Amino acid sequence: MLDKNKQIWFIGIKGTGMASLALVLHDLGYNVAGSDIEKYTFTQVPLEKAGIEVKNFDPANIKSNAEQVIVKGNAFKQDNPEVAACLDKNVEWQSYPDTVEEIVQMHTSIGVSGTHGKTSTTSLLAHVLGEVAPTSYLIGDGRGKGVEGSRFFVYEADEYRRHFLAYHPDYQIMTNIDFDHPDYFKDQDDYTSAFQTAADQTKKALFVWGDDKRLQSLKTDIPKYTYGFKDTDDFQAVNIEKTTTGSKFNVLAHGKDLGRFEIHLFGDHSILNTTAVIAVAYTEKVPMDDIKEGLLTFKGAKRRFAEKDFGDVSVIDDYAHHPTEMRATIQAARQKFPDKELVVVFQPHTFSRTKKYQKDFEEILRDVDKAYVTPIYASAREASGDISSEDLVNNIPGSEVIDLDNIADLTKHKNAVVVFMGAGDIPKYEDAYEKLL
């Protein structure tokens, strides 16, 4: 249990989720510190900025439960020196999800789950609600903020290994249910069952995308509101106007016009995410004029269609690594840059996912002006596999395999938008390319 009279010690504090959580607790007035590997990571920057002590792993860091509340990262097992020290000293620990659940219960809480769009929607919801009321948030890209006395707590609910089943929020947005994480979930039914349990644990209302049949099939004892573009949706986006600066649209709540909203975001998925945010805010009786203002100042989530310009070349950095996300990112790029050559540099993420979605990846990349595929990013759990980037390229006319040693090939593209897509270490390819511009 969290306790302001004890030190909150994080084993693995540099993990993206753990770093975010440490920042939230620090902001909420807890005494936070932690440890991790010595290697420098981007997540330690905000920790250091906040004055949170980050040490190397050392058994001496572990005291007693009378002095410390230990939060252990999911990746660390008995071979970690601090985990071993906990076992030797009979010191109990709690998990990341257990700790988040404690914060969930302190607030009017809104979880955002789904295969795609979690980070973007969580970021948008946290920003918009934060403009009208004190709001704490926890986002999967390494960002977290606590506000003492906050009304709302907005958090990204990750389905991997069923972590989100530790949570019992007031509200939950579910963006979609596409099968993912084949290394853990047996099949689509197994995956969907996790979302059914998450829905069962939501207290006040569920907000789901109306076009997703699996979301539609979820059984709930609480109100389940749909959002989308159809007349049958409870919250419907209508009169949509897309331009190269973003999108404008009205939202109807059960047929009632809530007004016209403008976002500096691109693609249908951004309109859907925004409609979900508006639906939650409306249900919590947040004034719509405040929501409109908040939407106008939102700049986007980290690594979600993040843009830089170099003369006539625009570079987009995006986390997309699943077919649905890739299609959304490409649609957004075409909306914002209709007159530029669309070049995609895609890093397949894990061998199992690449094998499962090979045909989808090939179909998507055949539709861009030029496709490059990097070597497959291997995960710690899956170091090799029986598929390669060459297998994809062989089925995509005009495409090429690209690596750091031939990254200069990208410089031949002029008046182009170059989209780097992937969830691994693809920023290293982008950095190498940008140094040549």
Curated annotation (Swiss-Prot):
InterPro entries associated with the record: Mur-like_cat_sf, Mur_ligase_C, Mur_ligase_C_dom_sf, Mur_ligase_cen, Mur_ligase_N, MurCDEF_pg_biosynth, UDP-N-AcMur_Ala_ligase_MurC
Catalytic activity: UDP-N-acetyl-alpha-D-muramate + L-alanine + ATP = UDP-N-acetyl-alpha-D-muramoyl-L-alanine + ADP + phosphate + H(+)
EC number(s) given by UniProt: 6.3.2.8
Binding of ATP, residues: 114-120
GO biological process, one term: peptidoglycan biosynthetic process
GO cellular component annotations of the record: cytoplasm
UniProt xrefs under SUPFAM superfamilies: MurCD N-terminal domain (SSF51984), MurD-like peptide ligases, catalytic domain (SSF53623), MurD-like peptide ligases, peptide-binding domain (SSF53244)
Superkingdom of this protein's organism: Bacteria
Places the protein is found: Cytoplasm
A Pfam family: Mur_ligase_M
Any GO MF annotation of the entry: ATP binding
Pathway: Cell wall biogenesis; peptidoglycan biosynthesis
The entry's keywords: ATP-binding, Cell cycle, Cell division, Cell shape, Cell wall biogenesis/degradation, Cytoplasm, Ligase, Nucleotide-binding, Peptidoglycan synthesis
General function of this protein: Cell wall formation.
Family listed: Belongs to the MurCDEF family.
Protein name according to UniProt: UDP-N-acetylmuramate--L-alanine ligase
